[in-house]
Amino acid sequence: MGQVVSMVARRANRFNVENRAHRVLEREKPTPAPKFDSNLRDMERTLELDPKFVDKLNMKDSSLDGRLKDVYVTSQDRFIKRVQERQAAEAAADNVEQRPLPLERKTPDDFEYGYLEPNRISPGHCTLRQALKFINDHQLDPESWPAKKIANEYKLKEPLVENILHYFKTFNMYIPDQKYKDTMLTQATQPLLRVKSSSEGNP
């Protein structure tokens, strides 16, 4: 039922639509929208004060027109320039994104210490590689590599180097002697043999 009603209403709206459209277009002046009561009261008050107000609005004022011709607007705002620069940058970025992708798809190698080491080191700083080196040198030969020599070598402050050498150490791998290892295993198995023999003797 609803489809039938909508179909009838649609056909009624489209009936003679061209003639109705021509009649609307042939009107010299469109029908103005209704005004609010407050606007009508303001208009009445204005006409009471100046009855020729409507004529003045419709009449061209030559003095105002001449002043308007002498007005020139010059803008020094850089907003338009910034917008153009941003649009140019976005266009360049789009062109870069449209470049062909690299064909090499292998995973890059990891860095030795987990980060890219800088090529230039400012005075008062050292890399992790340098710190491990002078810590290891000091542990192996403290007399040849004291804190003062390390500070001069790596351009560091001596108290800082002393703190590093005091609180940080490198790992040392200890490999026991094979003879000592065999001795420990023999000593560990002897009590087990004694316990086993005593348990077998006692029913």
Swiss-Prot record:
Any GO BP: mitochondrial respiratory chain complex I assembly
Subunit: Together with NdufAF3 associates with mitochondrial complex I assembly intermediates during its biogenesis.
Family the UniProt entry places it in: Belongs to the NDUFAF4 family.
Stored Pfam families: UPF0240
Phylogenetic placement of the source organism: Eukaryota, Metazoa, Ecdysozoa, Arthropoda, Hexapoda
GO cellular component: mitochondrion
Knockout consequences: RNAi-mediated knockdown in thoracic muscles is lethal.
Protein name listed in UniProt: NADH dehydrogenase [ubiquinone] 1 alpha subcomplex assembly factor 4
Origin superkingdom: Eukaryota
UniProt cross-references to InterPro entries, sorted A to Z: NDUFAF4
Function: Involved in the assembly of mitochondrial NADH:ubiquinone oxidoreductase complex (complex I). Together with NdufAF3, involved in biogenesis of complex 1 modules N, Q and P-peripheral, but not the P-distal module. Required for recruitment of the complex I assembly factor Timmdc1 to complex 1 assembly intermediates.
